[in-house]
UniProtKB/Swiss-Prot annotation:
Activated by potassium and other monovalent cations at 0.25 M, but partially inhibited at greater concentrations. Inhibited by validoxylamine A 6'-O-phosphate. GO terms for biological process: DNA damage response; response to osmotic stress; response to stress; trehalose biosynthetic process. Pathway: Glycan biosynthesis; trehalose biosynthesis. UDP-alpha-D-glucose binds at G22, G23, R263, K268, F340, L366, V367, A368, K369, E370. This is Trehalose-6-phosphate synthase. Catalyzes the transfer of glucose from UDP-alpha-D-glucose (UDP-Glc) to D-glucose 6-phosphate (Glc-6-P) to form trehalose-6-phosphate. Acts with retention of the anomeric configuration of the UDP-sugar donor. Essential for viability of the cells at low temperatures and at elevated osmotic strength. NCBIfam families: PRK10117.1, trehalose_OtsA. Induction: By cold-shock, osmotic-shock and during the transition to stationary phase. Expression is partially dependent on RpoS. It catalyses: D-glucose 6-phosphate + UDP-alpha-D-glucose = alpha,alpha-trehalose 6-phosphate + UDP + H(+). Pfam families: Glyco_transf_20.
Length: 474
């Protein structure tokens, strides 16, 4: 039986409990336990980058981690992955800060990681690469003679050609991506956007609906919407509340709660969300004194100016809205720029009447799925969800909104707050069925199954790939 080798920018420490490690870690660990294998990634530490890989083995899984130099981390991770790819893939070209040294560092680190992984590989290993930090990784492995089956999953959106082709290195990235055997995306829109970008650059031959050839390289594309662990989340959400939260719930027994939790990121649409809530207060004054909107948004990448700007904007907007609409004994908006324990959040989800998830662009958004899974099926809350979140393709019984239309979001919030119990139960049941069916294990099992079905490349095909190119005709 072939081993599974997983490569991601960061790895979850082997002593970290799966429940607190996040969705990706749960899925990866499930796949690794089933097949046995290796999880390879950055340790999270800088310095001593020349020291040997740190290896830890537990059961049939080996964790192999490495350090990066300060320069490598800055250029590969901060300056290119997060200052070029992240904003571009989330349709924010205005925030892209392309610098040629950062691009060189991005390629250099991917090559370095390929060098580090190469001695660990076995001939029949199946290799699964994750996310935008590692777009060129298969290309580097192929250059080193690796013919194994290599799959790639993109956790964030893939932009349309108008966006992607604005990147100075878009052509190189596209050709490098074709060195993967299987390219997985969150949604059909993402998959088609990738193929559109490719078709604009070179001739793409499609043998079947999702099997393609470009530059003489054969690959497949497929959609794998990532899921969650609904049973684990329901378990975390149930049970007694911590004393302080129980006291707060008792104090707010006549107040309906709108709740939201996101990383502080410009892709999440937080300023637009605040303005939509203000529109609710303005257009539907009957809710005054009877609702409360709590936004939890812990800082991420706090040293980046764009993130600092959002934080200051939210602080100002929260103060302005509370000053305008607040009353003695009633604060309409609570904004908390801090981290909360995941298990506590699931309990808060359960006692929230409305879950507000309105990113401007998101690959999937697991918070939306977690909110649904955390609800009491007999008395569930209502999910208000952005049409630009990948989850909207599955959670069609949510109230789907355009996050740029504050009046539409305000109307959806009013509808959610006044929705009948029967409709709430019906909508929740439909969404929960989808979430249970497409859980995190289903996601990884489908991807691995499809990757296993691909015939490994031969040395001869590798040589053909190097010489056979088919430029797009004018």
């Amino acid at each position: 039986m072939s081993r599974l080798v997983v490569v991601s920018n960061r790895i979850a420490p082997p002593d970290e409990h799966a429940a607190s490690a996040g969705g990706l870690a749960v899925g990866i660990l499930g796949a690794l336990k089933a097949a046995g294998g290796l999880w390879f990634g950055w340790s999270g530490e800088t310095g001593n980058e020349d020291q040997p890989l740190k290896k830890v083995k537990k059961g049939n899984i080996t964790w192999a981690s490495f350090n990066l130099s300060e320069q490598d981390l800055d250029e590969y991770y901060n300056q290119f992955s997060n200052a070029v790819l992240w904003p571009a893939f989330h349709y924010r070209l205005d925030l892209v800060q392309f610098q040629r040294p950062a691009w060189d560092g991005y390629l250099r680190v991917n090559a370095l990681l390929a060098d580090k992984l190469l001695p660990l590989l076995q001939d029949d290993d199946i290799i699964w690469i994750h996310d935008y930090h590692l777009l060129p990784f298969a290309h580097e492995l192929r250059k080193r003679g690796v013919n194994n089956r290599i799959g790639f999953f993109l956790h964030i959106p893939f932009p349309t050609p108008e966006i992607f082709n604005a990147l100075p290195t878009y052509d190189t990235l596209l050709e490098q991506l074709c060195d993967y055997d299987l390219l997985g995306f969150q949604t059909e829109n993402d998959r088609l956007a990738f193929l559109d970008c490719l078709s604009n650059l070179t001739r793409v031959t499609t043998r079947s609906a999702k099997s393609h050839t470009a530059w003489g390289k054969a690959f497949r594309t497929e959609v794998y919407p990532i899921g969650i662990e609904p049973k684990e989340i329901a378990k975390q959400a149930a049970g007694p509340l911590p004393p302080k939260l129980a006291q707060l719930k008792a104090e707010l027994k006549n107040v309906q709660n709108i709740f939201s939790v996101e990383r502080l990121d410009y892709s999440k649409g937080l300023p637009e969300r605040f303005l939509a809530y203000e529109a609710l207060l303005e257009k539907y004054p009957q809710h005054h004194g009877k609702i409360r909107y709590t936004q939890i948004a812990p800082t991420s990448r706090g040293d980046v100016q764009a993130y600092q700007d959002i934080r200051h904007q939210l602080e100002n907007e929260a103060g302005r809205i509370n000053g305008k609409y607040g009353q003695l004994g009633w604060t309409p908006l609570y904004y908390l720029n801090q981290h909360f324990d995941r298990k506590l959040l699931m309990k808060i989800f359960r006692y929230s009447d409305v879950g507000l998830v309105t990113p401007l662009r998101d690959g999937m958004n697991l918070v939306a799925k977690e909110y649904v899974a955390a609800q009491d099926p007999a008395n569930p809350g209502v999910l208000v969800l952005s049409q630009f979140a990948g989850a909207a393709n599955e959670l069609t019984s949510a109230l789907i909104v355009n996050p740029y239309d504050r009046d539409e979001v305000a109307a959806a919030l009013d509808r959610a707050l006044t929705m009948s119990l029967a409709e709430r139960i019906s909508r929740h049941a439909e969404m929960l069925d989808v979430i249970v069916k497409n859980d995190i294990n289903h996601w990884q099992e489908c991807f691995i199954s499809d990757l296993k079905q691909i015939v490994p490349r031969s040395a001869e095909s590798q040589q053909r790939d190097k010489v056979a190119t088919f430029p797009k005709l004018a």
